[in-house]
Amino acid sequence: MNSTDRLLGVLLAVVALILLIRISEANDCDLCGRECVSACGTKMFRVCCFNYNRKRSNMPPLWMPRSKIWEGADDPLVLLQHLAKKSSGKSLTTTKDSSESRKKEISEDKALQFLWRNND
């Protein structure tokens, strides 16, 4: 094998490598939708891809108004009751007692029992 054949082999290998890199870059530009193709190869491409994927996902927004979550979210007891309802399907305050303080004591006891049982 003479030096011309070696040089030709190296040249073909470099051209093949460049083609493979170009093909992979072209596929990467298509991953984030049509609106990001124009930004391919720039700094804004990552931002465009991030926004595109966030739009497509079913993630909840990073911020949600309190009225959308539930009322009384500042009260830890309300939060505990909400968690208990989610896990058991029924309310913690099931007593027919008319005294609000008695209802609160019962619900606090049940909330603490719930936390104690699920403290694994």
Curated annotation (Swiss-Prot):
UniProt region (Disordered), positions on chain: 87-106
The positions making up the signal sequence are: 1-26
Naming one, the record's GO cellular component terms include: extracellular region
Residue ranges, compositional bias (Basic and acidic residues): 97-106
Protein's cellular compartments: Secreted
**Tissue-specificity statement:** Expressed by the venom gland.
Q: Name one GO molecular function term.
A: toxin activity
Q: Which UniProt keywords apply?
A: Disulfide bond, Secreted, Signal, Toxin
Post-translational modifications: Contains 3 disulfide bonds.
UniProt record similarity statement? Belongs to the scoloptoxin-20 family.
UniProt protein name: U-scoloptoxin(20)-Cw1a
Name the species this protein comes from: Cormocephalus westwoodi (Westwood's green centipede)
Lineage of producing organism:
Eukaryota, Metazoa, Ecdysozoa, Arthropoda, Myriapoda
